[in-house]
Design a protein with these regions (language model features):
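A glycosyltransferase accessory/donor-loop signature
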Residues: 1-42, 198-323
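Histidine-anchored nucleotide/phosphate-binding helix
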Residues: 51-68
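Short internal beta-strands
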Residues: 72-80, 170-173
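Active-site-proximal specificity loops/subdomain of glycosyltransferases
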Residues: 88-136
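Short, surface-exposed amphipathic charged segments that create phosphate/polyanion-binding patches used
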Residues: 109-121, 184-188, 290-294
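Short aromatic/hydrophobic "clamp" motif used to bind/position activated sugar donors
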Residues: 142
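The conserved acidic donor/metal-binding loop of glycosyltransferases
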Residues: 146-150
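Conserved donor-nucleotide/metal-binding helix-loop-beta segment in metal-dependent transferases, i.e.
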Residues: 151-188
Length: 323
């Protein structure tokens, strides 16, 4: 009953924290000093940033820059950043490049001149991760970093890759339930399989039709990946998306499709998973492993489980403030 009356943000502690936790837990990032980055570096780090996660983003990216700052920082506005957000970002990373969503959309539509690709790109915000870093073609290597992430130690393997190049890579979510106790799936989820499941079930046929060798590793997560600027080819991407649209229709315009397509492209071109004991997606089942992690991705409804995310962020902010 109350779910029909109350807004989603007030329907429980999880929705409330996912809506307002940015200001509650991460605002003290404002007290940390700026970090100089390199706008001409061979590797760039790209994040899609929303107004309501701007503090969390600064904690995430500065937790990386604390260990390695010889990198170009691209902040992709999801369309909600305001003037104060932009000022805040520039105050903490003076050399960061902020990409205005409306402007890059105009550029993309004009330069690529492909209505179908433009439709896919604009259908869901996370698709900006798939299209825009490649469209910008800055330097030699691309890192994608979600805003709900933390580096707890120096990511040595990633730093070496950023300096010297190498094979593409990604991080993993563990297999099994994300929660310690599973609940019954909703009728909607039972009726409509996730797009990634549909693609996995049809992968052999998909490869035969396209003459490709796409693969998709179980647990692939696009929230922290690295690859060369020429790995994503828009001609190949159009062929893949056209085939997927013919099979699955508007499902390719919804949540999860961008990650699945990123997975096909990277895994199909030899990407390797970072060691899951060091780089992983946080769940209720692996919460005890955080103390030994290098990188943790705090996704969805598990983000504030046991409040480890804000506690670790608070420690990082203290370290940054003293640096």
């Amino acid at each position: 009953m109350f779910e029909r009356i109350l807004p989603w943000s007030l329907q429980g502690i999880g929705p409330f924290l996912n809506t307002y936790g940015d200001v509650l837990f991460f605002r003290h990032i404002r007290r940390t000093p700026p970090i100089e980055t390199n706008p001409r570096a061979s590797t760039s780090v790209h994040s899609i940033v929303a107004h309501r996660f701007v503090y969390a983003y600064l904690v995430a990216v500065k937790s990386l820059l604390y260990h390695f700052s010889d990198i170009t920082v691209f902040v992709h506005d999801d369309g909600s950043l305001n003037a104060r957000d932009r000022e805040l970002i520039r105050a903490h990373m003076p050399e960061a490049i902020i990409i205005d969503r409306a402007e890059i959309t105009r550029r993309f539509d004009h330069d690529i001149c492909d209505p179908f690709l433009s439709q896919v790109r604009s259908s869901y915000t996370s698709y900006l991760k798939l299209f825009d870093p490649t469209f910008l073609r800055h330097g030699q290597r691309i890192i994608l970093l979600d805003t709900d992430t933390l580096f707890l130690r120096a990511p040595t393997a990633v730093i070496n890759w950023a300096r010297n190049g190498g094979e593409p890579w990604y991080h993993l979510a563990p297999r099994g339930n994300m929660k310690a106790t599973s609940r019954e799936k909703s009728a909607t989820s039972q009726q409509e399989p996730h797009i990634q499941t549909l693609i996995m079930n049809d992968l052999v046929v998909l490869n035969d039709e396209l003459g490709r060798d796409y693969r998709l590793e179980q647990g692939f997560c696009a929230g922290f990946v690295g690859y060369s600027v020429d790995l994503v080819d828009f001609k190949e991407l159009r062929e893949l998306l056209t085939c997927l649209y013919a099979k699955f229709g508007d499902r390719i315009f919804r949540w999860g499709a961008e990650q699945a397509i990123h997975g096909l492209l990277l895994c199909g071109k030899g990407a390797k998973a970072l060691p899951i004991q060091d780089y992983f997606v946080y769940t209720q089942n692996n919460a005890g492993n955080v103390a030994n992690a290098t990188f943790v991705h705090f996704v969805g409804e598990n983000r504030f489980f046991r409040f480890r995310y804000p506690r670790l962020a608070a420690r990082l902010m203290r370290n940054l403030a003293g640096s």
